[in-house]
């Protein structure tokens, strides 16, 4: 990167006066409606609403919906969009989230009328194309993961975890093994793992990690007994390190009657190269909105399909999609199923996008993992002289750095993350995993170029150099974003989630 790096803001140069300070809420906009189309006489007789709905309680006054002209609303939304970072603006190295660029063609395919304008309760004969896509996607995902069958119903990764654990419970119950109520989970696991286990009514037992970041096999063996239903693992783990002892863990788990659960959050490092089923995993959940390039979106639209080995197929959520000759059908006759876990059949639009993504790569899908690992290792090599690394093990698709022990005493991960925003660069995940103090987790994904990786590394170097000169300036960052630091404690204790009119 040539020349000095200076903080910059996203958006247009020379902002208009309305950019100054906070963007008003849509309720605060309004005013002259301008020129509007004239109302057309349609010859429809009108009647009072009370006469049309006798006996129904009606509002005394209309709701306080904003009356905003369309041009004003369009500009308001445009300004908000420019204030938010996104992949159209630059790299998004949010560790453990796989924020890759999603191909626009997948969006176009998901909007085809034959997919977008159908209803899930139409007769199966009317939606053969949609059922065929689901049937074929299941088999593609089975080939990628090494599973026997997959349910496409779960709507997110954590939902998939809960679904997988419910199938594990059903499996043990069907064998009369009803006293298995514990789940072993590594200390570096995603927080959704213990949350999902608790929601399923299981007791969580934490397994410690080795200094190299991998699961301590001896600690697993110490906790394995007849009360353990499953072990949940992520591979590579949340430190970006491949679990080299996974085959041994699978062996001792199965010998003790427990099952091995695969959190597919990090499958982007392995897709096309290695399969969880070949490692001994019995249940797998995937994040289509990570590995298979469907959109991320605040709690949805996500998709967290769950795959199982042959021994657990009877417990899959119903219905499943089956093929009878050239016809596709929905099978509701599954007496051992855990039942439905989602309205309809899952987030179908996400399935269309993932299917298109996988078919576009075809047999070359291993390039996803190869380039994801290459990018992460290159970025890590650039940052080694800037931040200490959490572990010395070679990373896969992501890695964890730390500001603890850096050449600037008192440098915090939060300050680095906030200052990055001033440079128009999105921050890595901070303070996760919790086993690493002052953690910064970077995941560049396979869709980034060397130029964008160099930009991120150079900005990090500039921030550390700045901290050596004036650490207090970082402590108050960001300085050039529309919103600076917020009171996170107040926001957590007293969240304001809706607009209320001034009394």
Labelled PLM ranges:
Residues 129, 159-325, 411, 437-438:
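Conserved PLP-enzyme active-site core in the AAT-like
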Residues 98, 156, 189, 237, ...:
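Short, flexible loop/turn elements at secondary-structure junctions
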Residues 85-106, 153-161, 292-307, 311-312, ...:
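Conserved phosphate/anionic-ligand binding catalytic regions in large, soluble enzymes, centered on
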Residues 301-305, 309-344, 348, 353-363:
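Long, C-terminal catalytic modules of enzymes
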Residues 1-149, 166, 274, 324-341, ...:
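Non-catalytic terminal extensions of PLP-dependent enzymes
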Residues 148-154, 182-185:
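A short, small-residue-rich loop immediately preceding and capping a beta-strand
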Residues 151, 205-207, 428:
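General small-molecule cofactor/ligand-binding pocket signal
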